Amino acid sequence: MPLRDQSVTDWQSALDALLALPEIDGPVGYSGGVIAVGTRLAVVEPRIRAAVLFAGSFVPRATLGEAPRVTIPLHVLLQWDDEGNDRQAALALFDAFGSQEKTLHANMGGHTGVPQFAGAAANDFFIRHLA
């Protein structure tokens, strides 16, 4: 999956640049909307200690296959009536993640109906795992 792999390489380059700054230290989290990128990054990048993933994009078989290798804490957001994505595929991916700590936050509404409190819940997750 060339786009996913290039995105992961770009994220790793961004991490290299940010973590080289003297004012940046401590554990790193990831939050992103393309679940294939976030899953792959969680598998290959040991500097990522926790992730917030949006289950609102296509779930390729390769992503489902590598999900058991994701062992960091996860906070997964799912819009229950997302008109562009398969809910069952998102639930299967969540089930396949190998993380001992994973939470699924399902909200009513479509792809663009993410409630504002979802951001606060994601921030609280990062505070618990990165502070």
Map each language-model feature to its residues.
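Alpha/beta-hydrolase active-site loop
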Residues: 1-22
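Short beta-strand/loop motif that positions the catalytic acidic residue
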Residues: 70-71, 76-78
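A conserved short beta-strand
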Residues: 45-58
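Catalytic active-site module of serine/aspartate enzymes centered on a nucleophile-bearing elbow/loop
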Residues: 108-109, 114-131
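Acidic catalytic loop of the alpha/beta-hydrolase fold
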Residues: 80-85, 112-113
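Conserved alpha/beta-hydrolase "acid-adjacent" motif
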Residues: 62, 83-89
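Catalytic histidine neighborhood in serine/cysteine hydrolases
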Residues: 90-91, 95-114
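Alpha/beta-hydrolase fold nucleophile elbow
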Residues: 22-33
